[in-house]
Amino acid sequence: MLPSTIQTLTLFLTSGGVLLSLYVSASLSYLLYSDILLKFSPTEITAPKVPLDCANASNVQAVNRSATKGMTLLLSEPEWTYPRLSCQGSTFQKALLISPHRFGESRGNSAPLIIREPFIACGPKECKHFALTHYAAQPGGYYNGTREDRNKLRHLISVKLGKIPTVENSIFHMAAWSGSACHDGREWTYIGVDGPDSNALIKIKYGEAYTDTYHSYANNILRTQESACNCIGGDCYLMITDGSASGISKCRFLKIREGRIIKEIFPTGRVEHTEECTCGFASNKTIECACRDNSYTAKRPFVKLNVETDTAEIRLMCTETYLDTPRPDDGSITGPCESNGDKGRGGIKGGFVHQRMASKIGRWYSRTMSKTERMGMELYVKYDGDPWTDSDALAPSGVMVSMKEPGWYSFGFEIKDKKCDVPCIGIEMVHDGGKKTWHSAATAIYCLMGSGQLLWDTVTGVDMAL
């Protein structure tokens, strides 16, 4: 039933061959639909047997007042999305390369946009490839400033996954130098941050409408996660942070419903510095995030957010496989799990995605192959356990980008199949032209599929000298 129209619900009641025509208003039909969905099967719902006093109902034409039989309503699937079990597989394989600047000889509307911070988010029917553009294309005359993180020209854009982000293919969602997006099963939520460093502003767009804002709380580069937010039952959770890149930066989570902020969540625990979280569902109850500490440690801050209580806690990952860059030698940090160790200054956003199985859970991570530079990208996995307390090394699972190729930010996302979700990791491969020429990125994508070993790494195929 559509809440925008008045529906006629004809009920054939088997006792005495009674026919009732009920003219149900939009609001009543929607409430009935929602209430039944909460209490019964989403595909076939049997209503309880209750007396129906037709004589006292102003909008019901009574034909026979003896009707008391039950009725069966067939309803469509609920609109909101929920995490499901992952599709079967035991390894990741190379799925897709989006390397826009292989087409850099194109001009005009076919020219590739200059972008950075790409990420992917998926709804029930499509995935979108997002990025932050400098409002410039290659080739072109506006290369100056394309290595800057923040300026007045940057915008959040997207294309359908598999399309090249060119001028003509791209949708410009909003002015932004930091961004996120997610789909709740009904509509897209877009997040953009821009403004001066001392007073930046989060803007929210739901579908085509700009719906809400959130102001800086530490007056020091309010920013978001540069990857997909996460939705369950119509509620979407977004990580934000505000604070020094070389000091304290405490994160928060915003709970957003249909484009409007309905709650702020303040994590407890090890909160000194948390930014650029990559988040996903460990279960229908818990969102987990692997984040970046740019100030104090090469270990990743790891968030557990309970969506039933809307509470979150942060602790450092305990594994001896340190996931940030730069980082010390694996296993070299002594002391308890909360020890920072050395080489904690600086960092990089890391890939993280869940493999939800009936009897166990897999957590897949990515990190650069170089300990000091943004070069190469390797995949790791750990089944079950608790990232807060498990000190064991993560298991290497293959090379996605070799040491000869750039490996910058990485992120996780899930593609929705008909009955299961496909976990994937994306890698930003930056063409670093410095301050004298264009500075942009390709995106490599690896997804869970089949068995065996990860077979092949990715190259961008771009020569900036051409």
UniProtKB/Swiss-Prot annotation:
Disulfide-bond pairs as recorded = 87-420, 122-127, 182-229, 231-236, 277-291, 279-289, 318-337, 424-447
Q: Which InterPro entries match?
A: Glyco_hydro_34, Sialidase_Influenza_A/B, Sialidase_sf
Example GO BP: carbohydrate metabolic process
Q: Name one GO cellular component term.
A: host cell plasma membrane
How would you classify this enzyme at the top EC level?
A: hydrolase
Regulation of activity is described as: Inhibited by the neuraminidase inhibitors zanamivir (Relenza) and oseltamivir (Tamiflu). These drugs interfere with the release of progeny virus from infected cells and are effective against all influenza strains. Resistance to neuraminidase inhibitors is quite rare.
Q: Which residues does the annotated region (Involved in apical transport and lipid raft association) include?
A: 13-35
Q: Where is this region: Head of neuraminidase?
A: 89-466
Give the required cofactors. Ca(2+)
Provide the protein name: Neuraminidase
Q: What is the lineage of its organism?
A: Viruses, Riboviria, Orthornavirae, Negarnaviricota, Polyploviricotina
Gene encoding the protein: NA
